[in-house]
Amino acid sequence: MEKSGGRIVMDEIRSFEKAHLFDLGHPLLNRIADSFVKAAGVGALQAVSREAYFTVVDGAGFDSNNVGPPSEITGNKKHRFPNLRGESSKSLDALVKNTGKESLQWGLAAGLYSGITYGMTEVRGGAHDWRNSAVAGALTGAAMAMTTSERTSHEQVVQSALTGAAISTAANLLSSVF
């Protein structure tokens, strides 16, 4: 690969990071939509790659019981998408449905987090620090806990809020280190 070709590719990647995908007329809406679309794409890739992994593990005859978090029911394989086995249109429908659901969850989390941090920065007079990240992470974590399961307890919501705040704050503090 030539150096000039490498520079062109790197310039394209850098311009993608700075440019917004949408112009909806307000910076808040632009930021939320941009974050939603980018994270939804990541969520879709993650869901498809996870299913591809389980397909390879099952096809190769590996024991997938020892992969990932321990199963509550010992001896049974626990798959995220139990309907995705076999060569049928039902299997493809389940893959598309679950990939869409995962994309929506990732997109909502990113859009919510991005919108809250933008709003907090505006309200606090342009200050963007770990406090904004902690509040946005906590609210996003709590919201995601309430949307991922029908039987979510208040302990799970609080735990997700604390985890979201901790991860977001750590990422904000570490971003200044690197």
Swiss-Prot record:
The UniProt entry lists the main location of this chain as plastid
State one molecular function term (GO): protein homodimerization activity
- State any GO CC term: plastid outer membrane
Q: Which residue ranges traverse the bilayer?
A: 103-119
Q: What are the entry keywords?
A: Chloroplast, Ion transport, Membrane, Plastid, Plastid outer membrane, Porin, Transmembrane, Transmembrane beta strand, Transmembrane helix, Transport
Q: Enumerate the residue ranges of region (Contains beta strands).
A: 1-102
Which GO BP terms sit in this record?
Answer: monoatomic ion transport
Tissue expression per record: Detected in pollen and seeds. Present in leaves and cotyledons.
* Subcellular localization, as worded in the UniProt entry: Plastid, Chloroplast outer membrane
Q: Describe what upregulates or represses it.
A: Regulated by ABI3 and ABI5.
Q: How does it sit in the membrane?
A: Multi-pass membrane protein
By its UniProt entry, which PANTHER family does this protein fall under? Answer: OUTER ENVELOPE PORE PROTEIN 16-2, CHLOROPLASTIC, TIM23
Family, according to the entry, reads as follows: Belongs to the Tim17/Tim22/Tim23 family. Plastid outer envelope porin OEP16 (TC 1.B.30) subfamily.
Give the protein's biological function. Voltage-dependent high-conductance channel with a slight cation-selectivity; selective for amino acids but excludes triosephosphates or uncharged sugars. Non-essential amino acid-selective channel protein and translocation pore for NADPH:protochlorophyllide oxidoreductase A (PORA) and possibly PORB.
Q: How does it assemble?
A: Homodimer and oligomers in membrane.
Q: What is this protein called?
A: Outer envelope pore protein 16-2, chloroplastic
Organism the protein comes from: Arabidopsis thaliana (Mouse-ear cress)
Query: What is the gene name?
Result: OEP162
